[in-house]
Amino acid sequence: MVDHITDRDRRYTLFMLVVVFTSSHVDRQIMGILGQPIKDSLQISDTQLGLLTGIMFAVFYATLGMPMAMWADRNNRRNLISFSVFLWSLMTALCAAATNFVQLLLMRIGVGVGEAGSNPPSHSIIADLYPPEKRSTAMAIFGTGVNWGILIGFLVGGWINEWYGWRIAFLVVGLPGILIALLVRFTVKEPPRGYSESLVPEVAPPPFWSVVRYIWSNPVLRNVVAAGTLTAFSGYAAVIWVPIYLVRIHELGTGEAGTYLALTIGAGGAIGIYLGGRLADYLGEKYGEQWLAWVVTIAGLLSIPFMFLCFFASTSGMAILAYSLPAFMGTIYVACSFALIQNHTPLEMRSVCAAINLFIMNIIGLGLGPFTIGLFSDVFASSMGVDALRYALLVTLVAIAFGSWFYYRTGVWVRRVRGLTQT
């Protein structure tokens, strides 16, 4: 740990955390563009595909995230992130050797175990580097890793699959992560805790269940966790199943589908999350912190009709065009949620609060989102045939609607809480 962080150190650390977050989402989301070829090659069902991309990955990813976050609140966060990148990258590369469902499932669980140690300490480091008035923008920049990961995963994975097959695609995206792990370990500085706010922890990090009780008793945290979880349910389900929908129903190749989605979800979504974070910081500073939540409410409600049009489009062009707006705004919630949680959490609880939020978000969002769509698709298939996937995807619209409501409630509570603290 160092005692002083320069502006250059701050920018470089954030850049490397974005690279790490990008790598995790390349390795996580590549299953979306490779889903149909893997299904055909290994002869698995949509439910099994949902298990690979959802709940089995998420259970280990989310469950191990909490003890790793508690460790990070007491020890070196940079070293934990470095080890995590190495592990998930190795397990992604090993997916290339899988010859059946069980083997691939075990490799994907390994990816989840590796990724469990990255996000909570990253959030904590960013909170130490950037003060509250700049935190939404910093979290937005960090959150663009989701979209850059999708861009690289879909673009590289889609075309490598068409040229060399899905196994080589796993090798190509997995192995570079080992270099990233080394760069984090030897070039990133561990910042002092509370550095951005000139604070030091007044007490030792509290026990886990004390943090759980704190979150439950805090209406802002309670509502933003519910809101983010429901929005993540829709987002994770869509990012896995929309590529499969385009390949299966609209008969696009994985390279073509990956290119279109890399541009819409990847590049468009990255711009959206960054601008959303900047807008949230601007509105929050000018009109009140509640706008960090209300920006997401507006984005969610605007997305619903366009997603419906996407799922029932008669051509691939219409589907991709309709999906462009939801893709642009779909990850705005990431920066705003992360910033609100850090803003309303005591210094000594930040990593664990982030981990608890991610646990719930990932078990329900990442875990049940893709799995639920796969299950419904199999259930509807006997009566609807190939169109079963269209109707299964409607579940995502319900999740967005409820998520938008909880973001609205979050903003209401933020306004009340800030009003009380100022009187």
Stretches found by the model and what they are:
Residues L183-T187, I304-F306, C310-A313, L394-T423:
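Multi-pass alpha-helical transporter architecture, strongest
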Residues V2-T6, P192-V225, I249:
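Juxtamembrane intracellular "pre-TM" segments in multi-pass secondary transporters
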Residues L34-T63:
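Extracellular/periplasmic helix-loop-helix junction of adjacent transmembrane segments
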Residues T63-V102:
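Conserved MFS/SLC helix-loop-helix module at the cytosolic interface between two early adjacent transmembrane helices
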Residues M107-W148:
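Cytoplasmic helix-loop-helix junction between adjacent transmembrane helices
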Residues M31-G32, P219-Y274, G330-V334, F338, ...:
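Extracytoplasmic gate region of multi-pass secondary transporters
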Residues Q43, N76, A97-Q103, P131, ...:
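Helix-breaking motifs and short loop linkers at transmembrane-helix boundaries and internal kinks
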Residues F142, V146-F186, E190:
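Helix-loop-helix hairpin linking two adjacent transmembrane segments in secondary transporters
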